[in-house]
Amino acid sequence: MAGNFWQSSHYLQWILDKQDLLKERQKDLKFLSEEEYWKLQIFFTNVIQALGEHLKLRQQVIATATVYFKRFYARYSLKSIDPVLMAPTCVFLASKVEEFGVVSNTRLIAAATSVLKTRFSYAFPKEFPYKMNHVLECEFYLLELMDCCLIVYHPYRPLLQYVQDMGQEDMLLPLAWRIVNDTYRTDLCLLYPPFMIALACLHVACVVQQKDARQWFAELSVDMEKILEIIRVILKLYEQWKNFDERKEMATILSKMPKPKPPPNSEGEQGPNGSQNSSYSQS
């Protein structure tokens, strides 16, 4: 693992400009409102979380998978590859990169099938439609997009250091950790360094637990304006999440989501089993 975040591909290539991110998203916003797009982000983060828990993966593996998912759709439209295929593909790749051990082909497909059927049947009435050959091809596109920049830095380690420095580990760490987990339902991991996200989550935890940490934060040499920007995003997430009824809303939103268009049936375009073209679009 790269020892220095500031020299890593995460910082040099994958801290994005907010305006560029919104510009790339315009293709999808022709079909979805901003609020619907945001709900899709929450939903597919929940799918990845459920998949990871079903496979008994560590939270860091799940977080890495979520970042991969967000990176892909930061550069490509939702219609380029079906997110239902991309979600388990990201879990599969992250489990290898984070040295958790390769999730076997059979376990991955069984997990995706089970999770969609038991946890998300309100959104996906049909069976999980993909096989392992689809996942492997999707993994190729994902690796190509990320230019094999696979090391992801997360807020967990800096958060632990900050809480220990503050001397309030038992009081603040569990809540701040949960807030970090929730930030993966936003664009924050694409826009800010992990240490800033950790500080913002710690700040929110201090406010909730009524811990006066103003002096501690005042002594940091960090751009507090950026920390406040992150806090505003976190508070907005909780405000909107409160009114989001996944079970009632997701089927309609998914029906509006742009879908991959099968390319013309010409020679050489048929997939390994003759059917995967419906999950990819090169447009």
From Swiss-Prot:
Polar residues composition-biased segments: 272-283
GO molecular function: cyclin-dependent protein serine/threonine kinase regulator activity; identical protein binding
Name of the molecule in the record: Cyclin-C
Subunit structure of this chain's protein: Component of the Mediator complex, which is composed of MED1, MED4, MED6, MED7, MED8, MED9, MED10, MED11, MED12, MED13, MED13L, MED14, MED15, MED16, MED17, MED18, MED19, MED20, MED21, MED22, MED23, MED24, MED25, MED26, MED27, MED29, MED30, MED31, CCNC, CDK8 and CDC2L6/CDK11. The MED12, MED13, CCNC and CDK8 subunits form a distinct module termed the CDK8 module. Mediator containing the CDK8 module is less active than Mediator lacking this module in supporting transcriptional activation.
Function: Component of the Mediator complex, a coactivator involved in regulated gene transcription of nearly all RNA polymerase II-dependent genes. Mediator functions as a bridge to convey information from gene-specific regulatory proteins to the basal RNA polymerase II transcription machinery. Mediator is recruited to promoters by direct interactions with regulatory proteins and serves as a scaffold for the assembly of a functional preinitiation complex with RNA polymerase II and the general transcription factors.
Key word Cell inner membrane present: no
Domain Cyclin N-terminal: 46-144
Positions where Phosphoserine occurs in the chain: 275
Recorded name of the encoding gene: CCNC
Family: Belongs to the cyclin family. Cyclin C subfamily.
UniProt xrefs under InterPro entries: Cyclin-like_dom, Cyclin-like_sf, Cyclin/Ssn8, Cyclin_C_2, Cyclin_N
Subcellular location: Nucleus
Pfam families from the UniProt entry: Cyclin_C_2 (PF16899), Cyclin_N (PF00134)
